[in-house]
């Protein structure tokens, strides 16, 4: 099985969990996309993708529409995408992606969480080559789909891997090919269920159950922060 497939299996256990945390994070992504490219999803590919991902997490239509409207409000602060790299106990490494309207606050909060749990922030770029950045798409397997034919049709758009599990097709490519692969799927009238940019560790490590629990606690605290969007690790 390919790495995108393995990533998806692991992501079934993702910790975002509570809707009270999840929907505001998704709302930020929608608002930023609408603010940058306009409020019409048909004319704004990034917004279209953000809405698809929100719907995949069962975010109510009213919440999605409210997030789009916030983009045109004069009271809505500009959002900034920032990332942090960190090392934690047991050889764990973190790539922390955030979206914030106050970078000073976010830096302080993330650093405080890391320090309290025996982890430390690293210089930007320290882990850049420890993670591959991939675009991952999911869509339903239809009766008339032939995966081998589909693979051949999508190679020119940058396709690297294609897998299927339980009626869901997972495809991946280098993050730079996100737009071309997304467009190819849309041109083929394939309805995308999810589309995300992910960071995959080039050399994943294995931990004991107790070590895993230690790292999970740190990740939970990081993801409790309203500005933290995703935490990627090098844990297998």
From Swiss-Prot:
What is an annotated GO biological process for this record, any one?
Answer: regulation of DNA-templated transcription
Record keywords, A-Z = Cytoplasm, DNA-binding, Transcription, Transcription regulation
Q: Where is it chiefly localized?
A: cytoplasm
| Tagged with keyword Transcription | yes
GO CC, sorted alphabetically, is: cytosol
Pfam families attached here? TACO1_YebC_N, Transcrip_reg
Its annotated compartments are: Cytoplasm
Recorded hits in InterPro entries, A to Z, give: Integrase-like_N (IPR017856), TACO1_YebC-like_2nd/3rd_dom (IPR048300), TACO1_YebC_N (IPR049083), Transcrip_reg_TACO1-like (IPR002876), Transcrip_reg_TACO1-like_dom3 (IPR026564), YebC-like (IPR029072)
Q: Give the source's domain of life in one word.
A: Bacteria
**Keyword Transcription regulation among UniProt keywords:** yes
* GO MF, one annotated term: DNA binding
SUPFAM superfamilies named among the record's database cross-references = YebC-like (SSF75625)
HAMAP family per record: Transcrip_reg_TACO1
Q: PANTHER family recorded for this chain? A: TRANSCRIPTIONAL REGULATORY PROTEIN YEBC-RELATED, TRANSLATIONAL ACTIVATOR OF CYTOCHROME C OXIDASE 1
* Family the entry assigns: Belongs to the TACO1 family.
Q: Would you tell me the protein name for this molecule?
A: Probable transcriptional regulatory protein Suden_1389
Q: Which organism is it from?
A: Sulfurimonas denitrificans (strain ATCC 33889 / DSM 1251) (Thiomicrospira denitrificans (strain ATCC 33889 / DSM 1251))
